[in-house]
């Protein structure tokens, strides 16, 4: 008796095969908009306790898959587990977000440990193994890390700020010290991503949430080049690794990003100009995105129009339906269901 070959629609798109109905998932799909997430988060204690409890991290990873039937699960974790594994103090204050001991001078950068302790991240790898064992074979499992520039913005400032200008300023005033942070994060990210692949991840995503704040010259130096080095480093060990880049706010620099980094797909935010993306990006790599997350609060005809616009803009090429950034805590479950139903009904 021959065994039926299982295909993963998500992987198919990234590998070069367009789908009539695009695969879909949402950034931050495991989150506070879900009552089951909030219950598990309370059970865990703190946010980091949830990240480092393999059983509970696996549970919240699977919750949106059970509820919405997405084509991909992304492991529940945080981009700041890498600084944690580098020996930096990382904590999450309720209502205030992440806090770290800032690396805001060359002398302080000199105290940065250059070697990542992957043992500290074993709970993440165990959570990946659990999720892999419980996911349907056609569902893709995504591992991830933060891009070096974005992670560095938190390490330099010691927290999130409105525009993350402390890191940008350090890059101008002390480029050597800032480059050391980036170099450490590049090497650490390569090792972390490789371990995620070993633990069962099918695809990797590199989140450069703050890359778009950089001018073009600095974008090349601090966003494109570090991402290129990570992609190259991962593929040196795993030549077939599938990697998605997300340089949020890159805009007109998206073509340069995909050309020079070597990513297989790029996630775009809702401000990206559709024709430019179709002509200069989607002809070369798969495109992921790009519904405005606020439409999952608004709902109604505005949401329907937003979904239709994304499908119209990108369905002719390789496309993964997603948001332009993470879903917000005040998003409506009913509106997510409305979005899912509309995307699933589409045939292009």
From Swiss-Prot:
<feature type="binding site">
    <location>
        <position position="325"/>
    </location>
    <ligand>
        <name>substrate</name>
    </ligand>
</feature>
<dbReference type="Pfam" id="PF01208">
    <property type="entry name" value="URO-D"/>
</dbReference>
<keyword id="KW-0627">Porphyrin biosynthesis</keyword>
<dbReference type="GO" id="GO:0005829">
    <property type="term" value="C:cytosol"/>
</dbReference>
<keyword id="KW-0210">Decarboxylase</keyword>
<dbReference type="GO" id="GO:0019353">
    <property type="term" value="P:protoporphyrinogen IX biosynthetic process from glutamate"/>
</dbReference>
<dbReference type="InterPro" id="IPR038071">
    <property type="entry name" value="UROD/MetE-like_sf"/>
</dbReference>
<comment type="pathway">
    <text>Porphyrin-containing compound metabolism; protoporphyrin-IX biosynthesis; coproporphyrinogen-III from 5-aminolevulinate: step 4/4.</text>
</comment>
<comment type="similarity">
    <text>Belongs to the uroporphyrinogen decarboxylase family.</text>
</comment>
<dbReference type="GO" id="GO:0004853">
    <property type="term" value="F:uroporphyrinogen decarboxylase activity"/>
</dbReference>
<dbReference type="InterPro" id="IPR006361">
    <property type="entry name" value="Uroporphyrinogen_deCO2ase_HemE"/>
</dbReference>
<feature type="binding site">
    <location>
        <begin position="28"/>
        <end position="32"/>
    </location>
    <ligand>
        <name>substrate</name>
    </ligand>
</feature>
<dbReference type="InterPro" id="IPR000257">
    <property type="entry name" value="Uroporphyrinogen_deCOase"/>
</dbReference>
<protein>
    <recommendedName>
        <fullName>Uroporphyrinogen decarboxylase</fullName>
        <ecNumber>4.1.1.37</ecNumber>
    </recommendedName>
</protein>
<comment type="subunit">
    <text>Homodimer.</text>
</comment>
<keyword id="KW-0456">Lyase</keyword>
<keyword id="KW-0963">Cytoplasm</keyword>
<feature type="binding site">
    <location>
        <position position="78"/>
    </location>
    <ligand>
        <name>substrate</name>
    </ligand>
</feature>
<feature type="binding site">
    <location>
        <position position="209"/>
    </location>
    <ligand>
        <name>substrate</name>
    </ligand>
</feature>
<comment type="function">
    <text>Catalyzes the decarboxylation of four acetate groups of uroporphyrinogen-III to yield coproporphyrinogen-III.</text>
</comment>
<feature type="binding site">
    <location>
        <position position="154"/>
    </location>
    <ligand>
        <name>substrate</name>
    </ligand>
</feature>
<feature type="site" description="Transition state stabilizer">
    <location>
        <position position="78"/>
    </location>
</feature>
């Amino acid at each position: 008796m021959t065994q039926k070959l299982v295909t993963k629609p998500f992987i198919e798109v990234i590998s070069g095969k367009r789908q009539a109905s695009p695969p879909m998932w949402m950034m931050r799909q495991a989150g506070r908009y879900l009552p089951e997430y909030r219950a598990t988060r309370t059970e865990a204690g703190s946010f980091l306790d949830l990240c480092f409890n393999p059983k509970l991290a696996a549970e919240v990873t699977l919750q949106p898959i059970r509820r919405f039937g997405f084509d991909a699960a992304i492991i529940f974790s945080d981009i700041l587990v890498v600084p944690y594994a580098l020996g930096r103090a990382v904590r999450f204050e309720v209502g205030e977000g992440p806090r770290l001991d800032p690396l805001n001078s060359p002398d302080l950068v000199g105290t940065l440990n250059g070697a990542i302790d992957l043992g500290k991240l074993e709970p993440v790898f165990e959570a990946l193994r659990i999720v892999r064992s419980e996911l349907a074979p056609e569902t893709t499992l995504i591992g991830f890390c933060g891009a070096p520039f974005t992670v560095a913005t938190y390490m330099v400032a010691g927290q999130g700020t409105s525009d993350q200008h402390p890191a940008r300023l350090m890059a101008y005033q002390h480029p050597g010290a800032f480059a050391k942070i980036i170099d450490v994060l590049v090497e650490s990210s390569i090792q972390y991503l490789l371990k995620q692949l070993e633990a069962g991840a099918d695809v990797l995503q590199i989140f450069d949430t703050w890359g778009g704040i950089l001018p073009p010259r600095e974008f090349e130096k601090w966003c494109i080049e570090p991402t290129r080095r990570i992609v190259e480093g991962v593929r040196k060990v795993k030549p077939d690794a599938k990697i998605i880049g997300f340089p949020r706010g890159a805009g007109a620099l998206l073509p340069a990003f995909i050309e020079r980094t070597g990513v297989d797909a790029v996630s775009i935010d809702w401000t990206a100009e559709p024709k430019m993306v179709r002509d200069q990006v989607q002809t070369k790599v798969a495109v992921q995105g790009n519904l405005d997350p606020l439409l999952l609060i608004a709902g109604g005809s505005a949401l329907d129009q937003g979904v239709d616009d994304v499908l119209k803009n990108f369905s002719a090429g390789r496309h993964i339906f997603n948001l332009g950034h993470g879903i917000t805590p005040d998003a409506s479950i009913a509106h997510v269901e409305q979005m899912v139903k509309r995307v699933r009904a589409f045939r292009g």
